[in-house]
């Protein structure tokens, strides 16, 4: 087999019949599979050993040769080669067809490639292929032209003969009629008898005339058809074709079925056709030009690749290896077989029957029918169900054809190539492990011994506990005591990977050092739950074991949980104290007035602790303590304080204890710490300290949090839910107000909608008042309020539902039900209240289920479009960048920090020197914008910064590190080789489930829903035209408005005096857009001035319009802004750079308008880098460059338009992409991740990128000298510890045997 790491591209093309015969090891002639008595394959059948190889290793069919020593011999009795049985997975056979058949992919795909090539409509093509019409394949025009007069004369003679015959017959009939009438007259017959005879005679004469006329018409038609006969002409009338053939057979050839298509293809002149089409495109207009463009795509593909078009018609069909379509015996003697075997059997049966019919010389009609059936059976084999009804197996199930094996989630690509199962894994339920360090996990002993079995066995043999591997295995299985000691030793420092499904982002798999635990549950560190989105209500996790040294190193350095504290999406810590820990730290840092020991002073922390232990001092009492090891913050710092000096802190003992958890030089924190403050401190630590310190501090915070949460006595009981005593009075007051509204409604003073709106107002106010009363009524030390105030769990609205009132609930449409639920959960709901509150809640659950599926599909498309965005170089050297605001100057001269600095400017690189108002450089070009740098800029009064962005990056492939900026997950400049595209896709997809599905009814837009949440994100990324789109101004100018009863009409009079731009029929259901004039907002009116790209109506703007009017940069920024809007509204912080990576992929292509001297086809999408490169080449050679316009592609379309056919085929529309790729002879350069995963190469990202793979070790001078010293070892084999102990000389690397070839 070819080693996968040694090829750089993969090409796909059309196979000709010769190729198929070359691959084949023999022809399959019989439909038999295996002999049901002997269970051995039948000779010449679908499982034949002679063709495909032996079923048992080194054994021929008849048993003459058995054993490996006969390797390679072909048995003279049965003809089977003696070799390994696994060749049955790679050897192919073939079926020689008795008649050609077309390949259904090329004839039936949309658009039909065969139809485009031959310029035949798919309908006509189908008629020809399935024997419903004849097609003319060639016409000898010269011979026809030369002999035209002779032929015409012959036809003339024939016409005359028919006319003469007709006249003679009519004459005879007329005479007979006269004689009959005369005879009747003599006999004196009645008049009606005479009339009848006369009418009968006339009728017969009419028939004679008609018959002759029909014959003449037929002659005319035949002659007419013959004179105009052209190749590729269809003749549906069989009689007409027969007549033509009988009369003029030597002047043309024709036929039906795939053979005639093959004849057409063989005579087809690709170059001439291509030139003609190019001419049509140059000179043509409208439909003609469009059709020529589409045809040229197919024709040019054949021209460029030199593929032979007759490969689209098959004379033989390949048979895939039998072990890929196995047949297995079930209990009870029945067989289960792959559907392919049934499909192949139908082909072989029909083919054999056709051969027999042809040999017997059967009539044409019967043979044609059999040929049609053969065509249909080959169609079903390739793509069952593409044409007509699918072939079904038992139970009416459509059989799975070759195409179905590749398609969809269960197809080869997605099931087996992109997602493989791994050995060395286990799974179990998780429980919390509060005693673990951040980088540890608890692994159940039994699971560990199974996972590490080979390691344990080897070590048992090394330590002479066992004689050989077999006895070591027995020891492990019997769980002898020595096994546990060895296991401890083996797992030390050997990380394992833990994964929790669904793995929505890269933190869903992290590495830990295992600690052996009793029981059967995996223990997980509480701080990594957030990243895994895990809880301990029965979640399960999988364990995987990295085996090779490289894998272990990567797991330890890149994936260890203590190195993954920051979120790759926002760059902020994910490992935060949560739940109990928050409560504990909150309790620890509270300060209570009047607590025991308040106002005392202590000479040292130790003294205070002693007082606390004796019960003389409360944890939360305000005291003064002399501290030595802590650093005072700005407020507490004495005038002349030097580091290391003691100072007097006015604080509580709890806060001193808290500060002892933080790094030594961290300024003293003297505040109450709810969750937000704790998060800010962890954030600050992550910005200022190395990861190791942060991890250690987090562990200390976790331990302290649990310790003090236990001692805080926070518990929840029903008596903690205190209902405010004045609740009924409050509600009675509002009940009266509601009655007033009802009265006004009954009197007709309010409409139904107004009444509802009024009631909603009344009851919302009631709920707020009850909530205030409830908060005021809660005791200071109430557990529930403590949990909420500390930010550990829950929020005030939930407490209001528990202790205040449930309030208004909405129905599934999202409208409020105007009757409130007055009860709370403490008092209990009535049946009606319970029912209406359930109504909306159930909708919420159904919504979540739908959202999960939608969000998963969005992530998949995002990954697909961005998978080949990898950091390929450190700096692309571009001067371009994007200006971003970091602050706004207020009228009083103060700076107001921009709300979105966190997600826009933070973690980027400056694109130019940043100067203050005096021109002093505050930050040099290329500086990293972390929190300290941004603080510095704000202090210097800077409001806008020009930053590097992936949108302006000029790297040809992927992006460069400086344009991307800081990697959010490490806090440093991103490494070359980082797969930033996939990180971006995960960061956007992972919070997808949190986005709402609902479309909100917004006031003012009657009946029009404004799309928000997940559907809006999809609409943006797919670049769809939004529902109710808002027009934008094409040019700056004044506007003139006209107002009809149903529509607005807006006209823009451009400033530059060009012609007016009219926007007609703008629906009045959309309000006019707001503009701000002199700081006040109002709607646009007649005579206002608008800028280019300004919205004229409210609603969403069409991104394609933005691209057309404002250009690509604005379109990109617009998409980033709009996507961020949705995520921010849900409180999700994702950095802009992730959205930018995706948007960059959407605008990578240019549509060719005019191809100039290049090879591009007009109307085809081309990668921008390719377009620019080709233009440079053409201009250098003195030709005209191509012109094109940027085009915005949705992510699905962009994925399918990727250069890599492997990646596109494994995404969607597999057959269409493979069809196209084969015609174009597409070659996959294997640059993205997916292509390499599919063929099993290391991915070109991270440690697999070329510049890391091609590193060579250069020995130092000393090592070189030592290499030739006399070695001090006896045997030729060195144990690995030789290297560590310094015995002997350095080992020459060239001689050292690593067990496999690393070079």
From Swiss-Prot:
This protein's GO CC annotations: DNA-directed RNA polymerase complex
GO BP term, example: DNA-templated transcription
Cofactor note: Binds 1 Mg(2+) ion per subunit. Binds 2 Zn(2+) ions per subunit.
Keywords: DNA-directed RNA polymerase, Magnesium, Metal-binding, Nucleotidyltransferase, Transcription, Transferase, Zinc
Binding-site list for Mg(2+): 535, 537, 539
Signal sequence region: none
Chain residues that bind Zn(2+) 2: 876, 953, 960, 963
Assembly, per entry: The RNAP catalytic core consists of 2 alpha, 1 beta, 1 beta' and 1 omega subunit. When a sigma factor is associated with the core the holoenzyme is formed, which can initiate transcription.
Function: DNA-dependent RNA polymerase catalyzes the transcription of DNA into RNA using the four ribonucleoside triphosphates as substrates.
Protein name (Swiss-Prot/TrEMBL): DNA-directed RNA polymerase subunit beta'
Organism: Saccharopolyspora erythraea (strain ATCC 11635 / DSM 40517 / JCM 4748 / NBRC 13426 / NCIMB 8594 / NRRL 2338)
């Amino acid at each position: 087999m070819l080693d996968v790491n040694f090829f750089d591209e993969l090409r796909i093309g059309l196979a000709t019949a010769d190729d198929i015969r070359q691959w084949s090891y023999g022809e399959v002639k019989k439909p038999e599979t295996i002999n049901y008595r002997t269970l051995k394959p039948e000779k010449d059948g679908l499982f034949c050993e002679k063709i495909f190889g032996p079923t048992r290793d080194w054994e021929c069919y008849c048993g003459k040769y058995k054993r490996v020593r006969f390797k390679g011999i072909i048995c003279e009795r049965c003809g089977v080669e003696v070799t390994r049985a696994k060749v049955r997975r790679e050897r192919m056979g073939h079926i020689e067809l008795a008649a050609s058949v077309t390949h259904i992919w090329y004839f039936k795909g949309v658009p039909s490639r065969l139809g485009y090539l031959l310029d035949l409509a798919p309908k006509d093509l189908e008629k020809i292929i399935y024997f419903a019409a004849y097609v003319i394949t060639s016409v000898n025009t010269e011979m026809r032209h030369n002999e035209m007069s002779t032929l015409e004369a012959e036809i003339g003679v024939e016409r005359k003969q028919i006319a003469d015959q007709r006249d003679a017959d009519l004459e005879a009939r007329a005479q007979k009629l006269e004689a009959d009438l005369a005879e009747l007259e003599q006999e004196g017959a009645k008049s009606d008898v005479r009339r009848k005879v006369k009418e009968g005679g006339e009728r017969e004469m009419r028939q004679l005339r008609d018959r002759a006329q029909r014959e003449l018409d037929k002659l005319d038609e035949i002659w007419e058809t013959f004179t105009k006969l052209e190749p590729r002409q269809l003749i549906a009338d069989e009689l007409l074709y027969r007549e033509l053939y009988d009369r003029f057979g030597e002047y043309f050839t024709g036929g039906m079925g795939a053979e005639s298509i093959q004849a057409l293809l063989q005579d087809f002149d690709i170059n001439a056709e291509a030139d003609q089409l190019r001419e049509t495109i140059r000179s043509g207009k409208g439909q003609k030009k469009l059709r020529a463009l589409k045809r040229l795509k197919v024709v040019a593909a054949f021209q460029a690749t030199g593929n032979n078009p007759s490969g689209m018609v098959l004379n033989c069909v390949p048979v895939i290896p039998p072990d890929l379509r196995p047949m297995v015996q079930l209990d009870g003697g029945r067989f289960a077989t792959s559907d392919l075997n049934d499909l192949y059997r139908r082909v072989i049966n029909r083919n054999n029957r056709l051969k027999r019919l042809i040999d017997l010389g059967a009539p044409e009609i019967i043979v044609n029918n059999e040929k049609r059936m053969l065509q249909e059976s080959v169609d079903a084999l390739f793509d069952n169900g593409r044409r007509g009804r699918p072939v079904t197996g038992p139970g009416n199930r459509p059989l799975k054809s070759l195409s179905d094996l590749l398609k969809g989630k269960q197809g080869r690509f997605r099931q087996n190539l992109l997602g493989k199962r791994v050995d060395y894994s286990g799974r179990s339920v998780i429980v919390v492990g509060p005693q673990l360090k951040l980088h540890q996990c608890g692994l159940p002993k039994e699971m560990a011994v199974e996972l590490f079995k080979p390691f344990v066995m080897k070590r048992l043999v090394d330590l002479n506990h066992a004689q050989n591997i077999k006895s070591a295995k027995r020891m492990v299985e019997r769980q002898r005591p020595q096994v546990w000691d060895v296991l401890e030793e083996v797992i030390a420092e050997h990380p394992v990977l833990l994964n929790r499904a669904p793995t929505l982002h890269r933190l869903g798999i992290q590495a830990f050092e295992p600690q052996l635990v009793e029981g059967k549950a995996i223990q997980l560190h509480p701080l990594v739950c957030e990243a895994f989105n895990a809880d301990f209500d029965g979640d399960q996790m999988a364990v995987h074991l990295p085996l090779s040294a490289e894998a272990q190193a990567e797991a330890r350095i890149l994936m260890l949980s203590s190195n993954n504290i920051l979120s790759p999406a926002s760059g902020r810590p994910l490992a935060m104290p949560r739940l109990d820990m928050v409560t504990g730290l909150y309790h620890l840092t509270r300060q209570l007035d009047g607590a025991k020991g308040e106002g005392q002073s202590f000479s040292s922390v130790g003294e205070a602790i002693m007082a606390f232990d004796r019960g003389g001092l409360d944890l939360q009492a305000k005291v003064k303590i002399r501290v030595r090891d802590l650093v005072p913050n700005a407020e507490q710092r004495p005038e002349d304080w030097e580091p290391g000096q003691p100072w007097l802190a006015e604080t509580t003992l709890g806060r001193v204890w808290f500060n002892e958890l933080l790094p030594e030089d961290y300024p003293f924190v003297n505040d109450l710490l709810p969750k937000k403050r704790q998060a800010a401190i962890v954030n600050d630590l992550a910005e200022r300290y190395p990861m190791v310190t942060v991890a250690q501090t987090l562990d200390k915070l976790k331990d302290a949090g649990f310790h003090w949460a236990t001692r805080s006595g926070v518990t929840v009981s029903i008596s903690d839910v205190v209902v405010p005593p004045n609740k009924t009075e409050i509600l009675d007051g509002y009940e009266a107000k509601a009655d007033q509204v009802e009265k006004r409604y009954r009197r007709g003073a309010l409409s139904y909608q107004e009444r509802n709106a009024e009631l909603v107002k009344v009851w919302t106010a009631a709920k707020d008042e009850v909530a205030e009363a409830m908060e005021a009524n809660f005791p200071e030390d109430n557990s529930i309020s403590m949990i909420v105030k500390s930010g550990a769990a829950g929020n005030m609205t939930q407490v209001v539902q528990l202790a205040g009132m449930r309030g208004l609930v909405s129905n599934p449409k999202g409208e409020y039900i105007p009757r409130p639920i007055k009860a709370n959960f403490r008092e209990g709901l009535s049946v009606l209240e319970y029912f209406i509150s359930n109504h909306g809640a159930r909708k919420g659950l159904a919504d979540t289920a739908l959202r999960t599926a939608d969000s998963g599909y969005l992530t998949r498309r995002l990954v697909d479009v961005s998978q080949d965005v990898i950091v390929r170089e450190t700096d692309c050297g571009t001067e371009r960048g994007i200006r971003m605001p970091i602050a706004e100057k207020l009228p009083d001269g103060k700076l107001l920090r921009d709300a979105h600095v966190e997600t826009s400017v933070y973690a980027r690189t400056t694109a130019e020197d940043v100067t203050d108002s005096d021109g002093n450089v505050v930050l040099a070009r290329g500086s990293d914008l972390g929190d300290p740098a941004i603080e510095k800029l704000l202090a210097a009064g800077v409001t806008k910064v020009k930053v590097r962005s992936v949108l302006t990056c000029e790297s040809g492939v992927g992006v460069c590190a400086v344009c991307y900026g800081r990697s959010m997950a490490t806090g440093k400049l991103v490494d070359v080789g980082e797969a930033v595209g996939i990180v971006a896709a995960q960061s956007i997809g992972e919070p997808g489930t949190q986005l709402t599905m609902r479309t909100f009814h917004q006031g003012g837009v009657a009946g029009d829903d404004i799309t928000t949440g997940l559907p809006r994100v999809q609409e943006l990324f797919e670049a769809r035209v939004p529902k109710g789109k808002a027009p934008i101004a094409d040019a700056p100018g004044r506007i003139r408005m006209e107002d009809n009863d149903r529509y607005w009409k807006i006209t823009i009079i451009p400033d530059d005096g060009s012609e007016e731009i009219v926007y007609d029929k703008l629906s009045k259901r959309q309000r006019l857009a707001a503009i701000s004039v002199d700081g006040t907002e109002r709607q646009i009116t007649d005579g206002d001035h608008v800028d280019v790209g300004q919205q004229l109506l409210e609603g969403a703007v069409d991104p394609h319009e933005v691209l057309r009017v404002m250009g690509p940069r604005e379109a990109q920024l617009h998409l980033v802004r709009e996507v961020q809007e949705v995520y921010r509204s849900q409180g999700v912080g994702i950095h802009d750079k992730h959205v930018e990576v995706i948007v960059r992929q959407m605008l990578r292509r240019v549509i060719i308008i005019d191809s100039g001297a290049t090879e591009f086809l007009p109307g085809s999408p081309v990668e921008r880098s390719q377009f620019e490169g080709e233009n440079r080449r053409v201009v250098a050679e003195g030709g005209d460059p191509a012109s094109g316009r940027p085009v915005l592609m949705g992510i699905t379309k962009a994925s399918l338009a990727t250069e890599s056919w492997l990646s596109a085929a494994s995404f969607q529309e597999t057959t269409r992409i493979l069809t196209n790729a084969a015609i174009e002879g597409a070659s996959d350069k294997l640059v993205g991740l997916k292509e390499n995963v599919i063929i099993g190469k290391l991915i070109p990202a991270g440690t697999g990128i070329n510049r890391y793979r091609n590193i060579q070790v250069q020995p130092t001078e000393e090592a070189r000298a030592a290499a030739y010293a006399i070695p001090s070892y006896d045997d030729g084999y060195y144990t690995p510890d030789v290297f560590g102990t310094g015995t002997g000389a350095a080992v020459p690397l060239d001689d050292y045997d690593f067990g496999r070839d690393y070079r």
